[in-house]
Amino acid sequence: MKKEDLRIVYMGTPDFAVESLRALVEGGYNVVGVITMPDKPMGRHGSVLQPSAVKQYAVSVGLPVLQPEKLKDEAFLEELRALRADLQIVVAFRMLPEVVWNMPRLGTFNLHASLLPQYRGAAPINWAVINGDTETGVTTFFLTHEIDTGKIIRQRHLPIADTDDVETVHDALMAMGARLVTETVDLLLDGKTDAIPQEEFYKDAAELRPAPKIFKDTCHIDWNQPVKNIYDFVRGLSPYPAAWTELISEDGKRLALKIYQAEKRPAEHNFPVGSIHTDHKSYIDVAVKDGFLRLRSLQLAGKKRMNITDFLNGFKQIAEYTVG
């Protein structure tokens, strides 16, 4: 079968999923429909509906779009069957019921932003950086009953530099993933379906690191950690949702502070953990047990994000605070 004859239904929602869809469209593959989330209410009183990034791209190139509220809704399933897909591709969408992923004759494959079986879950890029990994990657795998556990089709590896954050890794994986999606389609067109069970990639489930969804409490900095761990934590949450702490004044006043960029400065010292040290012009150092975290870009609650010089110009009393 030629790629022009293979009927593909694509499922995805955020920016990360746009690149793979674009690669399929521009590569001449036959995308017959796109499934994405319903438009999201925005603005005051939810009066404005914001379409997903995938919908915006799909509409711009004239692709049919379906936006089901419920994936088991019979009206949606009838519309999906009418597309007569040979293959479904999922990139950053949602968990599919079997009635959906088992519909096409070639099955449904997913692009996941980790080297499965590591980092199964909703936030694989964040957790790889938070944990200080020096490598991550992308995986295509067939969907099955349990989330992120299906047979692996192909993987590509990406080094993580010590200066990378979630944004840089996300963008690199987005481009790499788009290439892997088209490569995977080509393999399936050639009849090469030698997918490998994930159990062959590890000996003990205890070796596996999860990638659970990140909540606000997840992002709170623990200043009792080593400086490298805190540094990795900051870059693993930057720019979104951002690591945060509280500035605590001598009288107990607390101000929420997001930290977007920092430097790790290992050193021996006798300062209390959480104490703040600054020249009031160009740097803020927070003492931790094995050094200092030098803050580079931050944001007080209710204020805009600032570099350290601008922040110090407007916050002269910073040294009177500690962090916690």
Swiss-Prot record:
Its EC number is 2.1.2.9. Keywords: Protein biosynthesis, Transferase. Gene3D superfamilies: 3.40.50.12230. InterPro entries: Fmt, Formyl_trans_C, Formyl_transf_N, Formyl_transf_N_sf, Formyl_transferase-like_C_sf, Met-tRNA-FMT_C, Met-tRNA-FMT_N. It is an enzyme of class 2 (transferase). GO terms for cellular component: cytosol. It comes from the Bacteria. Transmembrane segments: none annotated. (6S)-5,6,7,8-tetrahydrofolate binds at S114, L115, L116, P117. One of its GO terms (molecular function) is methionyl-tRNA formyltransferase activity. It catalyses: L-methionyl-tRNA(fMet) + (6R)-10-formyltetrahydrofolate = N-formyl-L-methionyl-tRNA(fMet) + (6S)-5,6,7,8-tetrahydrofolate + H(+). Belongs to the Fmt family. NCBIfam families: fmt. Attaches a formyl group to the free amino group of methionyl-tRNA(fMet). The formyl group appears to play a dual role in the initiator identity of N-formylmethionyl-tRNA by promoting its recognition by IF2 and preventing the misappropriation of this tRNA by the elongation apparatus. This is Methionyl-tRNA formyltransferase. It comes from Parabacteroides distasonis (strain ATCC 8503 / DSM 20701 / CIP 104284 / JCM 5825 / NCTC 11152).
